[in-house]
Amino acid sequence: MKNYLIIGIILLFPFRLFADEPVKAIYAKITNPDNKEVTVVAHRADWRFAPENSLAAIESSIRLGADVVELDVQKTKDGQLILMHDKTLDRTTTGKGKVAEWTLDSIRTLRLKNGAALRTKHRVPTLEEALLTTKGR
């Protein structure tokens, strides 16, 4: 559990670079013990519309009005941060093996699979791409 907490804190740091009014408002809402409003969190983004953790799923979550889009991050062989829930590529992409054994350039050649395990046109995004997609929204 301690490792997950540390990873969560480390991953929240880049969001401070992109913090603006929408982020501050959501943070204030979810940390207020007197808040009676429901906060909608899109787990792995809108994975029913597009592959989980894809830019299309993030865009759909925003269009649907989610307050928060929860994403998963893994590190590639060359130290790049990508959106990927699993430690392996097998379930969610057309590739096989551990994310940590692939470079970002190699992962860019793969396609994401949808919830039915069918190949899509979508590619694995980087954390930076996700942050830029959500900035100010």
Label for each model-derived stretch:
Residues 18-137:
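Phosphate-group recognition and catalysis centered on beta-loop-alpha active-site segments
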Residues 1-23:
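Bacterial Sec-dependent N-terminal signal peptides
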